[in-house]
Each structure stands twice: as C-alpha cells, then as structure tokens.
Amino acid sequence: MSPKISLTRYLVEQQRIDGHIPPELRLLIEVVARACKSISQAVNKGALGDVMGSAGSENVQGEIQKKLDIIANEVLIEANEWGGHLAAMASEEMDDIYVVPNRYPQGEYLLMFDPLDGSSNIDVNVSIGTIFSVLKKSEDDRGVEESDFLQAGNQQVAAGYCVYGPQTTLVLTVGDGVAMFTLDREQGSFVLTEENVTIPDDTQEFAINMSNMRHWDEPVKRYINECLEGKDGPRGKDFNMRWIASMVADVHRILCRGGVFLYPWDKREPEKAGKLRLMYEANPMSWLIEQAGGAATNGKQRILDIQPTKLHERVSVILGSKNEVERLTAYHSGL
C-alpha cells in the first residue's frame, strides 16, 4: 500500500521540486486548512453545538447571516491574523477589509474568503463549504488599502475550497493543476486523494436554478432549451440537470465528473452584473476549473481577466466543461 501523503508533505514537495510554493505561502495554506478543520467540526455538531439557525443580522449584501456564517468568519480571522503571513483579509461577510493588527507581524499576502458558501443549506444538512483566494500585496511600504485587493483573478497565487459533506474535502491549486485532499479524522490531517484533476471537455449535465428561467438573457434560454430538447433537438443527446444551491457542492461535482454550472445575469436586478461575488467566489472557482482543463466566463469575457472595481463586485458565472462554456460564449456573441 502506498504511503498516505499529507497536505503538509504535498506542499513541501511542491516547494522543493517545482518552486511553485514559497515557504510563506505554504504556511498560509496550512493555516487556512487548519481553520477549515475547525469549521468542519462546528458544521458536524449541527444542532448539538447550538450553531443552527439565523444570527439575526445581515451582511454587506443585505443577506441574513446564519450563526455558522459568523462562526466560520471568526475562525478564519483568528487562525490567520497572528501567523505573520498576511497583510490583510477580506470576507464576503464583512463590509471592509481586515488589516492584520499592529501587535502581529505583517506578511506579503492578502487572503479573501467566503467563510461558508451555501449557508441556506445548513439547516437541511446539505453540503456547504469554504472558498478562499490568495493574492500578493504590492511591494511598496505603505499600509494596506482596499485597492490592493482589486486585482484580476489571473493574479491569484493560490485558490481553493473545502466542502463539508459526507467527507470533508479540501481542493487546491497553486497554478500547477488541481489536487484534492480528504480529512482523515483519526489522523487529524488532510490526506492527498487525487492529483491532476481533469474535467472532460464534453458533458451531459448542467447545473442551474430553472425556476428563474423567465428572467434570463436569450443566449442562456437558448442553451438550456436545447439541453431540454435532448436527443430530439439540435444537441442530439439527452442532458440531466443538477442544482444544489451551494456553489462549492456544484463545482465539486463538476471537478469530479464534468458538467457546466450557470448563475447568469437576470432582469430582476438589471443594474447588477450577476449574483455571485467576483472576488470571493467566481475568481477562485474559475481558476480551479481552468487548472483542471475547463473554462469560465461571464458570457462575454474570461472571468479571470475581469478587472474588479470594488471589493464586493458581482458577476454572472458560467463555468465547467470547456466545449459547453465555449458554446455559451458563442451564443452570447450572437453566433
């Protein structure tokens, strides 16, 4: 039997062999992973840990916060603020950036996260997760500002998520492919379970909230209608629909077996480019998908090339198997 490779060993070997992971970045990723283990424990306790239900507050997007949203946010901040790897953090659950306090050493990295994606699923025991993205701070000596975070997704140096489901699985990229690690609860560490994850170019599964179909743009309606027509329509094959209402869970399925995920613009809020957050959700997930051989777009532009203008910017998201994403891009171009 081959020996188990822990996350720490994997990162050290990547650092040693490929040079993709500087020591400070390796330590930062390990701290994020430890925070995810703590969040996993809180999620697993459920009603026994008094973590279910609403916290009675709203986040910056005006969404009702769950107790676990706040707990996960605090866990990530407390785990990362003192290590000396970070200059600042930004969270979907916080209005402004969180600068590392002066009592702790400051590092060269910026951490962004959605502490608990899919939190509407908490009370019904469906998979949820943590999404994170790491950027490098500019090298000047001035203090950290919000503008330091406003980098295109192609500037990320690490990205990943941790899905809390039947197993707790950490999925990571540092720009050299995608690796998956499963939490060994007896050992207390993440163990490498899959390397060089690859998404098939073609698929027969799509993930979208069909109840919103009447609000979509015509290119998305056209694509979904063709999928629904199945083998009798222009696609010549049947499709299945999947929708978990947790981006982490839907993207994890796509990384495991292919598919296409859509959260498109809709006309109910025409002034907003989309629903999902560019910096906390779309960028890290798009990089993971691309690193696995897939593609990600807002319909008109590669997501990783979008230059953000504000911290909580929203975006339309289409990602997954390459040929399906390219078809959708062509439809948006009028082809």
Swiss-Prot record:
The gene is fbp1. It holds the Pfam family FBPase. Substrate binds at residues 117-120, 209, 275. Homotetramer. Belongs to the FBPase class 1 family. It is found in: Cytoplasm. Its cofactor is Mg(2+). NCBIfam families: PRK09293.1-1, PRK09293.1-3, PRK09293.1-4. Pathway: Carbohydrate biosynthesis; gluconeogenesis. The keyword Cytoplasm applies. Its EC number is 3.1.3.11. This is Fructose-1,6-bisphosphatase class 1 1. One of its GO terms (biological process) is gluconeogenesis. Mg(2+) 2 binds at residues 114, 117, 281. The lineage of its organism: Bacteria, Pseudomonadati, Pseudomonadota, Betaproteobacteria, Burkholderiales. GO terms for molecular function: fructose 1,6-bisphosphate 1-phosphatase activity; magnesium ion binding. It catalyses: beta-D-fructose 1,6-bisphosphate + H2O = beta-D-fructose 6-phosphate + phosphate. Binds 2 magnesium ions per subunit.
